[in-house]
Curated annotation (Swiss-Prot):
Role description: Cell wall formation. Catalyzes the addition of glutamate to the nucleotide precursor UDP-N-acetylmuramoyl-L-alanine (UMA).
Matching InterPro entries: Mur-like_cat_sf, Mur_ligase_C, Mur_ligase_C_dom_sf, Mur_ligase_cen, MurD
Subcellular location: Cytoplasm
Keywords from the UniProt entry: ATP-binding, Cell cycle, Cell division, Cell shape, Cell wall biogenesis/degradation, Cytoplasm, Ligase, Nucleotide-binding, Peptidoglycan synthesis
Gene label: murD
Protein's name according to its UniProt entry: UDP-N-acetylmuramoylalanine--D-glutamate ligase
Pathway(s) annotated for this protein in UniProt: Cell wall biogenesis; peptidoglycan biosynthesis
Any Pfam family the entry gives: Mur_ligase_M
EC number: 6.3.2.9
Organism for this UniProt entry: Borreliella burgdorferi (strain ATCC 35210 / DSM 4680 / CIP 102532 / B31) (Borrelia burgdorferi)
Main localization (coarse): cytoplasm
Length: 451
């Protein structure tokens, strides 16, 4: 499909959403004269912010909200689905053609792509890569699963500067001929098992980041490669990385040891030590800078000065010398475990707020932090039921609350000066919040109103 052909087509957007992706997609199509229907199971009230953002085009849009109409799917030339909609959705069987905002973007994009996926650490890594690459490529752009649709900056692309895309497994699922110049898999944990039939399907979707790549390099965590990805054929050079101790595998590999970065056992540079949760994104950024011949001294400075990004082990404020951290992006147990370990103190002064919606995961990894967390503060939810079973099995006391407000107030009440209150849910957010970002913002508002 050519850009000029958009104006002759009927598009149906399935899932406007609240995070900006549906709005950017709609604007991209409407500016090019598309005939557009937007359908979403959410109501007009729930979608008010997104609808208001499209107010300039209201005469060109027909909305079907609170339901889907089969006839809209039958009549559309192209259905553009939200990545979170499962491919076996009953309405999609009536579609003539199915795309996503990412697949549409890739049809028209001419910029080289650095693509990042993984269960956790994606957003931190792409944020670091953006800062590092900006030193050499002023026209670099950042988009994808980080909350910025690449369609929103399509008209600003120069056709030559690198484009950094963060991609979830859901976004990769529909990409059959994806061909970045650098593809990166940060790590793989059991996740989204409420979406996938099994873990193998999750791995297959993750592998789509590199299986059709024809130039450049693939960067994969050594353990993930050994366990899951070595069975997939790669047409390009595979380079592994290790956080600490390289796995014994016959591949090129880079790793970090006390802030020093080694490639095939040769020192290539260093950066200041940091929290465990940031080590993997930092060492990957350092190696990508090395590969692209970016000034490593400058990259080292960027990494050393990096304080993190919103919602990912984000320091909110100190209230009466009690330190509050927002880690709402930790939606799986392993991520919460890493965050707790990153904040570990000598006298274990972490009060952990955890719990939420189940994603068909287990919480056995919580045994690794049982001796680090001083107080377990739980918010009701389907995942919380599983957490309670783990804690009770180990005879660990916990405190259960119906709301985030009550949990925060209790955490503050029991904390002494020097304590840490960490909000790291290890679960999805859908029972009490619009999404994980809404959850994080509510936590920060509650903290800012303390004291």
């Amino acid at each position: 499909m050519l850009l000029d052909e958009i104006k002759n087509l009927n598009f149906l957007i399935m899932g406007l959403g609240l995070n900006g992706g549906g709005v950017a997609l709609s604007r991209f199509l409407l500016k090019r004269g598309a005939k557009l229907v937007i359908t979403d199971l959410k109501s007009e009230t729930e979608l008010a912010l997104s609808i208001d953002a499209l107010r300039d085009f209201e005469d060109q849009i027909r909305y079907v909200l609170g339901k889907h109409d089969v006839n809209d799917f039958k009549n559309a030339d192209i259905v553009v689905k939200n990545p979170g909609v499962k491919p076996n959705n009953k309405y999609l069987k009536f579609a003539k053609r199915i795309e996503t905002d990412i697949s549409l973007f890739l049809m028209f994009n001419k910029n080289p792509i650095v693509a990042v996926t993984g269960t956790k650490g994606k957003s931190t890594l792409v944020s670091l890569l953006y800062q590092a690459l900006k030193e050499k490529y002023p026209g670099v752009k950042l988009g994808g699963n980080i909350g910025v649709s690449p369609l929103s900056f399509f008209d600003q692309l120069d056709g030559k500067s690198p484009l950094i895309l963060e991609l979830s497994s859901w976004q990769l699922q529909s990409l059959e001929n994806f061909n970045p110049i650098i593809s990166i898999i940060t790590n793989v944990y059991n996740d989204h098992q409420n979406y996938y039939l099994n873990f193998d399907d999750y791995i297959i979707d993750k592998s789509k980041i590199f299986v059709n790549q024809t130039s450049g390099i693939v960067i994969i965590q050594d353990q993930a490669y050994c366990k899951y990805f070595s069975k997939f054929k790669s047409k390009v050079r595979v380079i592994l990385f290790s956080e600490f101790n390289p796995c014994d595998f016959d591949q090129d590999i880079f790793y970090c040891n006390e802030g020093k970065v080694y490639f095939n056992d040769s020192l290539i540079g260093s950066f200041s030590n940091s929290r465990a949760v940031f080590i993997i994104p930092k060492v990957i950024t350092f190696f990508v800078s090395y590969y692209l011949n970016i000034d490593l001294n400058r990259t080292g400075q960027i990494l050393s000065n990096f304080k993190g990004i919103e919602h990912r082990l984000e320091f909110v404020k100190s209230v009466q010398n009690v330190m509050f951290y927002n880690d709402t992006a930790s939606t799986i147990p392993e991520s919460t475990v890493l965050s707790v370990k990153s904040l570990k103190t000598k006298d274990n002064r972490i009060n952990l707020i955890v719990g939420g919606t189940d994603k068909e995961l287990d919480f056995l990894s919580f045994s690794k932090i049982a001796d680090i967390v001083r107080t377990w503060i739980l918010i009701r939810g389907s995942a919380t039921v599983k957490i309670i079973k783990i804690l009770e099995k180990s005879s660990i006391q916990y405190f259960l609350f119906d709301s985030l407000r009550d949990a925060v107030n209790y955490a503050f009440k029991i904390s002494s000066p020097g304590d840490i209150v960490l909000f790291s849910p290890a679960s999805a957010s859908f029972e009490l919040f619009n999404n994980e970002f809404d959850r994080g913002l509510q936590f920060k508002n509650l903290v800012n109103n303390l004291g």
